[in-house]
Amino acid sequence: MSALRRSGYGPSDGPSYGRYYGPGGGDVPVHVPPPLYPPLRPEPPQPPVSWRGRGGAPAETTWPGEGAGGDGYYPSGGAWAEASRAGGGHQEQPPYPGYNSNYWNSVRPRAPYPGSYSVRPELQGQSLNSYANGAYGPPYPPGPGASTASYSGAYYVPGYTQSNYSTEVPNTYRSPGNSPTPMSRWMYSQQDCPTEAPPLRGQVPGYPASQNPGMTLPHYPYGDGNRAVPQSGGTGRPQDDAWASSAYGMGARYPWPSAAPSAPSAGSLYMTESASPWPGNSSPQPPPSPPPQQPKDPSYSYNPSGQGLSRHSFPCSVHQYESPGAVNNDNSDLLDSQVQYSAEPQLYGNASSEHPSNQVPSNNLPEECFSSDEGTPPSIKKIIHVLEKVQFLEQEVEEFVGKKTDKAYWLLEEMLTKELLELDSVETGGQDSVRQARKEAVCKIQAILEKLEKKGL
């Protein structure tokens, strides 16, 4: 440990100044003026160290910055390595010959300049001083004594670095180099290495580190990254206007509905005039319908005139539920208002016009039944229901081509037999009209069965 004081150049067993061991080997009293900055703390006494050279006269101890007016104070406690012992004498040098002693450990308080870029709250108090020029480093040059590595330029990066920068781009919150903690050592703290200026804006939290240390990056404020993106003339707004007139019924500029539902456009393809998906929506269509009937599928009830075609709110034809041909022309409205029934789908629309003679009994039968009174007995309704099914089966029999061994033949025969059993279960109730209607229906089914049997031979 060195016993010399930077201010007095004397050993520790005497006064702190006034004695100097010159190169001649004798004690030459030299009166040095008192130091400009007195020591802040007393130093513990240290054992005297002989400064005599081992091979003769002692070598001079060269103090960096001594002739340039250096006024710093170097407290004892730092290790001074013996650089060389060649020639019988040794010369002590500081571990980093390019730096002044007051540059490393200075007693001057460092007041950071207020910068225009605010540091994040989690990084305040960690010796991270931000400056308006975008560089991080010591707050002011080290002093007039240190002329070797004077840090004057704002964008100056020293030619040598003492840390290993990884070649990969670090993460947003990854510490640079080999620092142990992720957040406490973003910049190397100025107690450790104050002269090293990191890459400019390279390791600010939230920005990836630059691969080139000397390249300056433009600083964009947080949350405003796309301000520098050039706007393409007049193509941005017409494109939005083109999307605004979309076919999905959104009249607003953006396609998704906001908290207040937007009114659908007049040319909407997927909006119905009777009901809209949003209940509180005010639609600008000309005459809104009175209370809608909530159709099962909005696409089926798009045409307002097609809603009254059937009771089931399907746009299918009413002829699916009535007998084909002349029956629909004569009393289709009467049947539809009195009888509610279901039947197989109509497969052949032109088959009824080929055999009009077979439909004459069925045409007269409903008229005779309904001419008596509006309150049709249930037995008559059941007979009419059976006759409607027989109409479709008769069409199937007319189209049948095959033999008795075919499955189609078995199916038609079984269906006709089932309708005969339905007619047998009808109770007449002592009424001649019901008995007559049932008899005619049974005769018709038997005639169809005979026709089917002849075709199957």
UniProtKB/Swiss-Prot annotation:
Biased segments, Pro residues type: 31-48, 284-295
Protein location: Cytoplasm
One record GO biological process: positive regulation of actin filament polymerization
Tagged with keyword RNA-binding: no
Keywords of this entry: Chaperone, Cytoplasm, Methylation, Phosphoprotein
Biased composition regions of type Polar residues, renumbered to the chain: 160-193, 326-335, 348-365
Gene Ontology CC: one annotated term: nucleus
SMART domains: BAG
Residues found modified as Phosphoserine: S7
Feature: compositional bias, Low complexity: 1-20, 255-268
Primary residence: cytoplasm
InterPro entries per the UniProt record, alphabetical: BAG_chaperone_regulator, BAG_dom_sf, BAG_domain
BAG domain segment(s): 379-456
Chain residue ranges for the region called Disordered: 1-104, 128-335, 348-374
Annotated GO MF terms: protein-containing complex binding; protein-folding chaperone binding; ubiquitin protein ligase binding
Highest taxon of source: Eukaryota
Any one Pfam family match given in the protein's UniProt record, by short name: BAG
Residues recorded as bearing Omega-N-methylarginine in the entry: R41, R54, R108, R185
Chain's role: Inhibits the chaperone activity of HSP70/HSC70 by promoting substrate release. Prevents constitutive TNFRSF1A signaling. Negative regulator of PRKN translocation to damaged mitochondria.
Assembly, per entry: Binds to the ATPase domain of HSP/HSC70 chaperones. Binds to the death domain of TNFRSF12. Binds to the death domain of TNFRSF1A in the absence of TNF and thereby prevents binding of adapter molecules such as TRADD or TRAF2. Interacts with PRKN.
Protein name, per record: BAG family molecular chaperone regulator 4
